[in-house]
Amino acid sequence: GVPCLCDSDGPNVRGNTLSGTYWLAGCPSGWHNCKSSGPLIGACCKQ
């Protein structure tokens, strides 16, 4: 998957670890959305 920025990673991509994974169809089973204001399509999820 594509790495994405969780809320816990910091305010922006610069200098922060991207600990989430971007899923186009939403978070798979056992994962949770880790970004409150995500893109309109897909979700930034964490295991």
From Swiss-Prot:
Compartments where found: Secreted; Nematocyst
Gene Ontology terms: biological process: regulation of signal transduction
Superkingdom of this protein's organism: Eukaryota
Keyword Metal-binding found: no
Disulfide bonds, paired cysteine numbers: C4-C44, C6-C34, C27-C45
Entry similarity comment: Belongs to the sea anemone sodium channel inhibitory toxin family. Type I subfamily.
Function recorded in the entry: Modifies current passing through the fast sodium channel (Nav) in neuroblastoma cells, leading to delayed and incomplete inactivation. Paralyzes the shore crab (C.maenas) by tetanic contractions after intramuscular injection.
UniProt protein name: Delta-actitoxin-Ael1c
